[in-house]
Amino acid sequence: MGSLEMVPMGAGPPSPGGDPDGYDGGNNSQYPSASGSSGNTPTPPNDEERESNEEPPPPYEDPYWGNGDRHSDYQPLGTQDQSLYLGLQHDGNDGLPPPPYSPRDDSSQHIYEEAGRGSMNPVCLPVIVAPYLFWLAAIAASCFTASVSTVVTATGLALSLLLLAAVASSYAAAQRKLLTPVTVLTAVVTFFAICLTWRIEDPPFNSLLFALLAAAGGLQGIYVLVMLVLLILAYRRRWRRLTVCGGIMFLACVLVLIVDAVLQLSPLLGAVTVVSMTLLLLAFVLWLSSPGGLGTLGAALLTLAAALALLASLILGTLNLTTMFLLMLLWTLVVLLICSSCSSCPLSKILLARLFLYALALLLLASALIAGGSILQTNFKSLSSTEFIPNLFCMLLLIVAGILFILAILTEWGSGNRTYGPVFMCLGGLLTMVAGAVWLTVMSNTLLSAWILTAGFLIFLIGFALFGVIRCCRYCCYYCLTLESEERPPTPYRNTV
């Protein structure tokens, strides 16, 4: 009985190779439990006998820690067998071990948000905004009596601008330190050249005006040559021939347009048109070279300068409305075909539908600007100073609507943000409606004023459709805001293969 009191039930002295807590893996056969006979209990061996008769302990059969060594299965990621991660070859991580943490997605995961949220390749951005280049080319052709040679030259200029912007967009980000100062310098000089031409009368062959135009054209040519040299040095041999051909085409078209403007005894119109095209190109390149911060602000300012130059060409030139509308419609179809068939930027049905709505809004805005220019040109000579101010104010509203549309395209397809683009379009539609309503109140060309009002309303509806009723509910509905404010529970990262 004394032995039963001294030895607990099922317990024994710790084995030498076992756990320090006294657990030896269940091998307690030499120490019987209390149910056995107490008289046959063997005496424990001494230290010498234990060392001579000791056998290695059985493996530690713990399902959590593994076999034998507790830390045998814990190796650094660099020393692990790569065959463990063969199943991860197609997960976008090149078969490497998963990271030690899983980053959370900061974007909203609203249950009603549309799937497949993506943005186009930035290289395709000039393709989307190319209608504005053709728009300005059509204005240039109309200002220069719309001869066949001028139409061909203006179209070639627009194509070369598109080609140069598309090639430069993929390289501008790597060379932003060099491109941005040259772009800003060229834009500032050309903008002040425009401002000075407004202060000078327009007699034929004015020497000061011609010198300003030559200086602006020279700086633009230097900028284009610098960009071409950078492109030639950066790209391989397969790009050099295309770049040189595009640069020569661009310079030739600019020279032909300037010569045509001088021969038509209208250097101001030619300068305004060419500079507006160049400013738009510089805005795109500047925005692509630094998509955030000062780059976007510079693009907006350059676009404003281009819009002011466009306003000058609308006031001073004569427009061929049918030619402009046909060019806009044709290029809209071309943009749709290019973007749907281009393999480098695959389009889903959602992106294609949004692109179609943007193209439709572009046609409506172009028709509103054409109608406003017609009203302003019709009443330009017969209006008094009191009647000219509201007409000019309405035209400026239309120009601001065009600027908002350009910013909508830049934010939509440049950054992938689908919120601010439709908001800009809605604001542009409201400004167009205000311009049409003012012209209806003044009773100047009632039919065109009514069409401007209708076009603004349709643009506003398109912007609201792009914004989405569900997204509007998300930002305004109390229940949706409550869902957005709820914190998501943190999920631990599991390194399971």
Curated annotation (Swiss-Prot):
Output a single Gene Ontology CC term carried by this record: host cell perinuclear region of cytoplasm
Any one GO biological process: viral latency
Q: Which UniProt keywords apply?
A: Host cell membrane, Host cytoplasm, Host membrane, Host-virus interaction, Membrane, Modulation of host E3 ubiquitin ligases by virus, Modulation of host ubiquitin pathway by virus, Phosphoprotein, Transmembrane, Transmembrane helix, Ubl conjugation
Q: Which intervals carry biased composition (Polar residues)?
A: 27-41
Topology Cytoplasmic: residue spans: 1-123, 169-177, 233-241, 289-296, 340-354, 410-422, 471-497
**Record's miscellaneous remark:** In healthy individuals, EBV typically establishes a persistent latent infection in which the virus can be detected in resting, nonproliferating peripheral B-lymphocytes. These latently infected cells express only 2 virally encoded genes, LMP2A and EBNA1.
What is the protein name for this chain? Latent membrane protein 2
Q: What is the lineage of its organism?
A: Viruses, Duplodnaviria, Heunggongvirae, Peploviricota, Herviviricetes
Q: Which gene encodes it?
A: LMP2
